[in-house]
């Protein structure tokens, strides 16, 4: 079915035949207005083809991550990207850079403006000229201090149905709660007190998608971001979009229909743009946003951060390995956004049903011991942990270890993410080897601040120039791994992976390119003890009798020990990472 026809069907499902038809006509006019105004990349992408390859990796950062006197932070960020990451990191996710009132950007006051304290759209476009730009569409809610909400409270008829109100005494007990905060808050309007739906906080008021004008407005903003250079758009908190009393108001069928609508719009007017859904929920629910390959192009691997942390805490990859075996590559039509750290904490919910409760409890205690904090949410059974707030390096590498060991252990954890099928997303504080920022939590009172420190640009550069600093060791090691990853098409997100048997302390994976001509054997030791792995000699399809390997990161030639004609063995040092490909004589 053509995208235009899919749009018509979806809008009829969402709004009913009559309103759906009117909304489709309005959408058709909106899309016509954008045609020819959207800057496509040099390469044209056919609808249905995932425009990613092994060179893709995304830096996750705030727009004001780096401060330098007399310069807009977005301009400083652009300089850092061009000077230090060109040719190594292909994309950048700039977290919300719009005027905001709270939540470090996720309470948007004006969707079409750049925060003037950070820079201008010119700064954003300049970054998009050199890097694949990922932008947030914060579409579940906006700021209670926004012009939209102000006009709603004033009784402006243009905005009277932009937000969701409920009558006092309405039974909301069946609504899924991601936070330990009230679901509704009272505001004073021109008509008197009103109770407004607030999924996340009093300052984040939920938008009413039962009003087609809200949906059309967000589609227009989506395309505006594309016009400014965005090639990946993150649908923030999308799982909670559609509200219907009597349902949990999470993963509603009409929410999925809205995602399908955005996908159809991309295929119609901007097929080079990728949609990624942010749904911090159990794995099975998370991947439901692939739909029938007609929703998100990418979903976050929310289970990965807690599973990798568990593997390093217990020196046992068993649960990580079994979960990785369930990952479907879907023939390369969609893929995963692999990450271990972000501006948020480590989600507990995605690990439920994968890790035993006692291991999750042990992880929570370990996070506390390593200087982290725990955030809770409300359930009918009371408040339960939903997020571990800690810098990932602080979580993985104990502070009493020497710097080289801390760096090596942390980089081994990152190698798991870089090895798995999907596109890597690397949080700036992981790339830079940052640690817990407890002083920030004391300043803001927010647990998440522990991993959101803003940095002096000159101060960071000074540390990176010191080869003995933890920042330098992590940064240089990370760049080496990223450069090595770009050497082999086996790491293509559309490729294949096979999870291998190995000692419980070793995560072993075979990656294969989409055309099956390149392969990499990925080995990561999650313990400090040397380990030996034995594999069949025929493990590489492209070179079944290979007697020599090339290690991609170091470029060294490795000679495995031949156990017999059918098997070889490889030894890994503590926290060692090996990416091995069959040796090919360059002569």
UniProtKB/Swiss-Prot annotation:
InterPro entries hit by this protein: GGa_phosphorylase (IPR033746), Glyco_hydro_13_cat_dom (IPR006047), Glyco_hydro_b (IPR013780), Glycoside_hydrolase_SF (IPR017853), O16G_dom_2 (IPR045857), Sucrose_GGa_phosphorylase-rel (IPR016377)
Superkingdom as given in the UniProt entry: Bacteria
A single MF term (Gene Ontology): glycosyltransferase activity
Enzyme Commission code(s) on record: 2.4.1.352
Pfam families: Alpha-amylase (PF00128)
One annotated GO biological process: carbohydrate metabolic process
Keywords carried by this UniProt record: Carbohydrate metabolism, Glycosyltransferase, Transferase
Catalytic residues (UniProt): 236
Catalytic activity: (2R)-2-O-(alpha-D-glucopyranosyl)-glycerate + phosphate = (R)-glycerate + alpha-D-glucose 1-phosphate
Family: Belongs to the glycosyl hydrolase 13 family. Glucosylglycerate phosphorylase subfamily.
Purpose: Catalyzes the reversible phosphorolysis of glucosylglycerate into alpha-D-glucose 1-phosphate (Glc1P) and D-glycerate. May be a regulator of intracellular levels of glucosylglycerate, a compatible solute that primarily protects organisms facing salt stress and very specific nutritional constraints. Cannot catalyze the phosphorolysis of sucrose.
Name of the protein described by the UniProt record: Glucosylglycerate phosphorylase
Gene source species: Spirochaeta thermophila (strain ATCC 700085 / DSM 6578 / Z-1203)
């Amino acid at each position: 079915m053509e995208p235009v026809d899919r749009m018509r069907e979806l809008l009829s499902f969402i709004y009913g035949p009559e309103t759906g038809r009117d909304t489709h006509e309005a959408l058709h006019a909106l899309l016509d207005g954008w045609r020819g105004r959207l800057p496509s990349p040099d390469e044209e992408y056919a609808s249905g083809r995932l425009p990613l390859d092994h060179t893709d990796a995304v830096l996750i950062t705030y727009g004001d991550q780096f401060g330098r006197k007399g310069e807009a932070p977005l301009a400083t960020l652009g300089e850092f990207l061009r000077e230090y990451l060109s040719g190594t990191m292909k994309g950048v996710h700039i977290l919300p850079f719009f005027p905001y009132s709270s939540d470090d950007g996720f309470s948007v006051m004006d969707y079409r403006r750049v925060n003037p304290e950070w820079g201008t759209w010119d700064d954003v476009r300049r970054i998009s000229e050199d890097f694949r730009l990922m932008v947030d569409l914060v579409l579940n809610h906006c700021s209670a201090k926004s012009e939209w909400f102000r006009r709603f409270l004033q009784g402006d008829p243009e905005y009277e149905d932009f937000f969701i109100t409920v009558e006092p005494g309405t039974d909301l007990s069946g609504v899924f709660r991601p936070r330990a905060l009230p679901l509704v808050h009272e505001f004073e309007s021109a008509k008197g007190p009103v109770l407004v739906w607030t999924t996340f906080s009093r300052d984040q008021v939920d938008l009413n998608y039962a009003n087609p004008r809200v949906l059309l407005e967000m589609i227009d903003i989506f395309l505006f971001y594309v016009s400014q250079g965005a090639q990946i758009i993150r649908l923030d908190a999308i799982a909670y979009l559609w509200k219907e009393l009597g349902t949990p108001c999470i993963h509603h069928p009409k929410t999925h229909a809205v995602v399908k609508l955005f996908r159809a719009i991309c295929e119609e007017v901007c097929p080079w743009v990728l949609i990624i859904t942010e749904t911090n929920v159990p794995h099975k629910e998370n991947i439901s946003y692939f739909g029938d390959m007609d929703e998100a192009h990418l979903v976050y691997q929310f289970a990965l951060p807690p599973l990798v942390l568990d593997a390093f805490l217990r020196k046992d990859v068993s649960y990580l390995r079994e979960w990785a075996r369930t990952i479907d590559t879907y023939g390369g039509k969609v893929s995963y956004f692999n990450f271990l750290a972000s501006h948020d904490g480590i989600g507990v919910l995605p690990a439920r049903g994968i890790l035993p409760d006692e291991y999750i409890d042990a992880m929570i205690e370990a996070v506390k011991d390593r200087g982290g904090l725990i955030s809770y949410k409300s359930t009918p059974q009371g408040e339960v942990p939903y997020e571990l707030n800690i810098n990932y390096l602080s979580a993985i590498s104990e502070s009493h270890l020497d710097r080289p060991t801390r760096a090596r252990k942390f980089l081994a954890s990152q190698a798991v993410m870089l090895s798995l099928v999907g596109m890597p997303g690397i949080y700036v504080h992981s790339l830079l080897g940052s640690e817990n920022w407890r002083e920030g939590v004391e300043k803001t009172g927010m647990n998440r601040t522990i991993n959101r420190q803003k940095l002096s640009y000159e101060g960071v550069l000074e540390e990176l120039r010191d080869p003995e600093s933890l920042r330098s060791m992590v940064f240089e090691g990370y760049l080496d791994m990223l450069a090595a990853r770009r050497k082999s098409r086996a790491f293509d997100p559309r490729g294949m992976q096979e999870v291998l048997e190995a000692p419980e302390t070793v995560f072993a994976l075979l990656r294969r390119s989409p055309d099956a001509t390149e392969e990499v054997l990925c080995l990561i030791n999650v313990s400090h003890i040397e380990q030996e792995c034995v594999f069949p000699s025929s493990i590489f399809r492209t070179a079944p009798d290979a007697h020599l390997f090339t290690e991609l990161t170091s470029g060294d030639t490795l000679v495995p020990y031949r156990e017999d004609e059918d098997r070889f063995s490889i030894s890994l040092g503590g926290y060692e990472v090996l990416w091995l490909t069959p040796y090919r004589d360059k002569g």
